[in-house]
UniProtKB/Swiss-Prot annotation:
Keywords: Cleavage on pair of basic residues, Disulfide bond, Secreted, Signal, Toxin. One of its GO terms (cellular component) is extracellular region. Residues 23-96 form a propeptide. GO terms for molecular function: toxin activity. Disulfide bonds join 101-121, 105-117. It is found in: Secreted. This is Conotoxin flf14.2. The cysteine framework is XIV (C-C-C-C). Belongs to the conotoxin R superfamily. Residues 53-91 are annotated as: Disordered. It comes from Conus anabathrum floridanus. The lineage of its organism: Eukaryota, Metazoa, Spiralia, Lophotrochozoa, Mollusca.
Length: 122
């Protein structure tokens, strides 16, 4: 989120930086070259983004279905981690315990927290 705001601020700032020389008397010799609808839209978007951030609302103002496909989070089907029954363990092998379950849950599935893994394994 912070990176997007920084990029937007840089875009708005750099859009106002290109200057053209103005030879009109009584005016500053430099004036912004870019006073387009695009610059106004960027400023308006930044204002809305900062206002939403101050209100604690999500930063993306568009509906999820209107986002570009690369911006959508892929739906990942996570395999169910379960504790095997005692009967499934071959004789002579160590029985699967809660700590092993939590360990493999944490390293095997990206994005799971310790609390999620503990809840699933117990």
């Amino acid at each position: 989120m912070g990176f997007r705001v920084l990029v937007l601020i840089v875009m708005v700032t750099t859009s106002a930086l290109p200057f053209t020389f103005s030879e009109e008397s009584g005016r500053s010799p430099f004036r912004p070259a870019l006073r387009s609808e695009e610059a106004q839209a960027l400023r308006h978007g930044l204002t809305l983004l900062l206002a939403r951030r101050a209100d604690g609302q999500p930063s993306d103002m568009r509906q999820p279905e209107m986002r570009r496909p690369e911006m959508r989070r892929p739906e990942v089907r996570r395999p169910e981690v379960r504790q095997p029954e005692f009967a499934e363990s071959p004789v002579g092998q160590k029985r699967w315990d809660v700590n092993d379950c939590i360990h493999f849950c944490l390293i095997g599935v990206v994005g799971r927290s310790y609390t999620e893994c503990h809840t699933m394994c117990t």
